[in-house]
Swiss-Prot record:
Main subcellular localisation: nucleus
Bias-annotated ranges (Basic and acidic residues): 146-162, 174-185, 192-216
Keywords, in A-Z order: Isopeptide bond, mRNA processing, mRNA splicing, Nucleus, RNA-binding, Spliceosome, Ubl conjugation
Transmembrane annotation, as ranges: none
InterPro entries: Nucleotide-bd_a/b_plait_sf, RBD_domain_sf, RRM_dom, snRNP35_RRM, U1_U11-U12_snRNP_70-35kDa
Disordered: region residues: 146-165, 173-222
GO cellular component terms listed in the entry, alphabetical order: nucleolus; U12-type spliceosomal complex
Gene Ontology MF term list: mRNA binding; snRNA binding
GO BP field: mRNA splicing, via spliceosome
Gene label: SNRNP35
Native source organism of the sequence: Bos taurus (Bovine)
PANTHER family named in the record: U1 SMALL NUCLEAR RIBONUCLEOPROTEIN 70 KD, U11_U12 SMALL NUCLEAR RIBONUCLEOPROTEIN 35 KDA PROTEIN
Domain RRM: 51-129
Record's protein name: U11/U12 small nuclear ribonucleoprotein 35 kDa protein
Pfam families linked: RRM_1
Amino acid sequence: MNDWMPIAKEYDPLKAGSIDGTDEDPHDRAVWRAMLARYTPNKGVTGDPLLTLFVARLNLQTKEEKLKEVFSRYGDIRRLRLVRDLVTGFSKGYAFIEYKDERSLLKAYRDADGLVIDQHEIFVDYELERTLKGWIPRRLGGGLGGKKESGQLRFGGRDRPFRKPINLPVVKNDQFREGKRERRERSRSRERHWDSRMRDHHDRGREKRWQEREPARAWPEGDWERERDFRDDRVKGREKRDRSK
């Protein structure tokens, strides 16, 4: 596939539900729900989406001050928002950090992913809600990433990029039959040749007895031909598999 990309450039719920982005039918109800959903980004969110990072898998006890301390190492922060439950005020375990310049954003994106903060290994990605066309959040069956235990894995993002599809060669039936017919004809030709040689050998054997038996088995010519053909087929098959990888 010449247009294959590990990271989605546009959000498609059906493709996101497939490990290689090739599914043609939804495999669970959440994918169906995401395909039917219509989502409009929150207009109350401010700041430049192209300078904003999404930070997830935070310890629920991690505070804004700690995040600012860690992420200010990469550049000047314009805005930091730790998302909290509206009722309880408890952290939901993710935040958005807006930098003042792109250089700081890229440095944090590259170096902060996988950092351990308050005994939790964090995940860092670009903000997608306002930057990825067609975005559907996880609560509507979409999103990206996730864990196997959740039963809602989504592919095409930094956490779980698409795997490259495996393109198996298609053999047409008529080509298969033609090749099979040719192999049968070659096999019959070798068998006729072999029968003729065996009859000659049997006749000569009546006139002369072996004085001693050879220590090792001598392969008749027909067997050598079969063995050579077998090896050639194995080599061709291995080369074909190597080219298809």
